[in-house]
Amino acid sequence: MSDISKQMNNLSVNDGANTVNNNNSFRGGRSQYVPPHLRNRQGGGNQSGSSSESSDVPFGGSQRGGFNSNGFNNNRGGFNNGGYNNNRGGFNNGGFNNRGNYNQSFGGRGGRGGFNNGGGRYQRPTPGVGKWQDGKHEPAPRNEKLEVELFGTADDSHFQSSGINFDNYDDIPVEASGDKVPEPITSFTAPPLDELLVENIQLSRFTKPTPVQKYSVPIVAAGRDLMACAQTGSGKTGGFLFPVLSESYMKGPAPVPESNGAFSSHKVYPTILVMAPTRELVSQIYEESKKFSYRSWVRACVVYGGADIGQQMRNMDRGCDLLVATPGRLKDLLDRGKVSLANIRYLVLDEADRMLDMGFEPQIRYIVEECDMPAVKDRQTLMFSATFPRDIQMLARDFLKDYVFLSVGRVGSTSENITQKILYVEDDEKKSVILDLLSANENGLTIVFTETKRMADNLADYLYDQGFPATAIHGDRSQYEREKALAAFKNGAAPILVATAVAARGLDIPNVSHVINYDLPSDIDDYVHRIGRTGRAGNVGIATAFFNRNNKNVVKGLIELLSEANQEVPDFLTKIAREGAFGKMTRGGGRGGSSRGPSRDFRRSGNSGWGNSGNSGWGNSGNASSSGWGGNSSSSYSNTNSNYGGGYNNNQRSNFSSGGSYGNQTGSNSWW
């Protein structure tokens, strides 16, 4: 054979027939052309008579070095570690919030670049996504694979439901005030809940409602607004997700307004809006909403700062009926014309007091009052938090109508499921003491709280050097780094998490058995929320705090909390509290211990201490310019203490917290 014949044979389009196996699923029959520059490459189209990759790779999946229907080597920097997967166009449901993830395979509409290969007219049914058709809710068929990913298995410790003390919640006092408060439910049944939601609750292995859930379900079903104060870890997330999803399943989506403008077809019209202060909290709420919206017509989305806004917008294009957002990122999307709030039926503010403390009041007021959101009378508003100080309640009147005030347990207090230990430890002895604590408690997960980001990094490095696998999260770490750290913590690869206040509020991480306040916060409310990371959902936990005279500003609040939770009060705390000089400092540092969340509805408080407001206007939903604060209530929050309202507008991040808990969160845009 001549040389030219040999070369032509090498270039034969039939070379490797019946052996090419790429993402186009070619397995035999007609030969497929393989470009010369890809021939004889490892992972390429021709493997000398053998297939290039396993035929089990799902459609759109990544093959390192191979080529698929979307082009050569579609792994766009794909990283797979502990469940995080950045494979764009993949079908891996194990990731956090990426393209090719759950938004595509579960919550998607078959949008651009997704499962339907380019957003064509034909849309293959998406697993786990139901529809609303002809005025009727049609749930999707069950999907065993999705159910394992969403709900885990009965013996999976990462899917914690209730603990050994869950029945004790029946003994917690509940106060519900307002006109004609609906009777609470006693179990998850249909009715009053939608049948599909009850099935999803059962898949989550929740056997009975917590006190806040017992009341929130009938309150929302009756069309009432709700302000709920409940112990941390008492099921507040389910307290708003259960009722709003149940009502949405029964009522269906609102009709989308007629398109106005060239880009209106790309605008999303969510029915439910949930706002929370941090990206960790909104991500957690989003993960829970995926469980309880499984098989329904409701598709959940999450948006927050510090992540690619373009990718978040593309995720929204696939369907956005329930939007979980931080105020800053939501305002950005509203300004871009990507989101319309015209169809909002349910507005939820979670950790409302913290959002205001962090300076989010201007954004929240803009979103609620200046955009196209329905008026107070045309929507239902729910506010949830573990604390509602008096000034926060007064501000909340602008967003609520004829609401029920729900106080569950000791509002602003801690759970008796948490054993609290206060140790007197000088600063230079803390590292030695924490090693002793960690050595004695090797089971479960431990969260260690510090006041500064530098200390968080230093302590995590120190513990790692001492043989304790530790990782850290704080405001200076990127979103990817924080997700990776949280994943390592949850799966036990790094069972010690060193964190600043960024992780103190709202995160529900199963199996946290020990919380250590390496640095005590200057605000007693922050202490409450930190230790609330353990003892959740009726489980028991231990909270240890290192105290010395640098923490004297919270001594009074600590004694109150320990006494209320039937915990031992150390003698050194009592001694320091009796020293008269320290009593004044409690009022100066943070909110101290004297202004923790109220347990009573202040609509009952009459004229005591409220200037000229009395009861007039407090029960109403009038605007903030009423005379409730001597004619200046609209500026009371921003001007009475410039450490709160004024901080954000001047971009002085260090002014967010009078006590300094958030003062060290420089550049905190990364976690809005």
UniProtKB/Swiss-Prot annotation:
What segments bear the compositional bias annotation Gly residues?
A: 107-121, 586-595, 608-620
List the molecular function annotations (GO) for this entry.
Answer: ATP binding; ATP hydrolysis activity; eukaryotic initiation factor 4G binding; G-quadruplex DNA binding; G-quadruplex RNA binding; mRNA binding; RNA helicase activity; RNA strand annealing activity
Q: What is its EC number?
A: 3.6.4.13
Extent of motif Q motif: 186-214
Q: Which Pfam families match?
A: DEAD (PF00270), Helicase_C (PF00271)
Enumerate the Gene Ontology biological process terms.
cytoplasmic translational initiation; negative regulation of cytoplasmic translational initiation in response to stress; positive regulation of formation of translation preinitiation complex; regulatory ncRNA-mediated gene silencing; spliceosomal complex disassembly
Report the subcellular localization: Cytoplasm
Q: Which GO terms describe its cellular component?
A: cytoplasmic stress granule; nucleus; spliceosomal complex
List where Basic and acidic residues composition bias occurs: 133-142
The record's function comment reads: ATP-binding RNA helicase involved in translation initiation. Remodels RNA in response to ADP and ATP concentrations by facilitating disruption, but also formation of RNA duplexes.
The protein's name is: ATP-dependent RNA helicase DED1
